[in-house]
Amino acid sequence: MNFPKVGSKIQIQSYKHNGSIHRIWEETIVLKGTSKVVIGGNDRILVKESDGRHWRTREPAICYFDSEQWFNTIGMIRADGIYFYCNLGTPFTWDEEALKYIDYDLDIKVFPDMTFKLLDEDEYAMHRKMMKYPPEIDRILQRSVDELVSWIHQRKGPFAPQFVESWYERFLQYR
């Protein structure tokens, strides 16, 4: 299987459990692309929502996708520090068209001091009923929230000191 090449521009597509498109991020530059991990960088890119709305991101960001974890992270570089937005969802797939995953509603926002907040539990509860998430998905997601919190506490993976900054330096080489 081919994986996105370093320096190439890719699209990121998130879907819902029922197969409908949720959100599309245009033009993320691949900084690392392997069977296990894809790391990308972007800045002020267009994001299209499933309801037709669209908007631009406000700051540079480093995205981290892991083929074994049910979450991905976006490290947003702001004047007052690095914020993370973490999406709970399936491990990524790559099919030459885009990097894809299924979004399962729950999110964790991490602040520069590494405190964090679990978000969208109400949306998850609603979609779990509406889209009939199987019990196994619920178990996987609860374990994944725990794993993600552990990574935050341990400063592991994308939360490691200088992770976002060093990948951002590489991103600047492609701009």
Swiss-Prot record:
Cofactor: Mg(2+)
Binding site for Mg(2+) 2: 105, 107, 120, 123
A Pfam family it matches: DUF402
Residues annotated for Mg(2+) 1 binding in this entry: 87, 103, 107
Catalyzed reaction equations: a ribonucleoside 5'-triphosphate + H2O = a ribonucleoside 5'-diphosphate + phosphate + H(+); a ribonucleoside 5'-diphosphate + H2O = a ribonucleoside 5'-phosphate + phosphate + H(+)
Catalytic residue positions: 23
GO molecular function terms attached to this record: magnesium ion binding; nucleoside diphosphate phosphatase activity; ribonucleoside triphosphate phosphatase activity
Entry annotated with the keyword DNA repair: no
Uppermost EC category: hydrolase
Sorted UniProt keywords: Hydrolase, Magnesium, Metal-binding
EC number(s) per entry: 3.6.1.15, 3.6.1.6
Keyword Magnesium: yes
InterPro entries membership: DUF402, FomD-like_sf, Ntdp-like, SA1684
Function comment: Has nucleoside phosphatase activity towards nucleoside triphosphates and nucleoside diphosphates.
Family of the protein in this entry: Belongs to the Ntdp family.
Protein name: Nucleoside triphosphate/diphosphate phosphatase
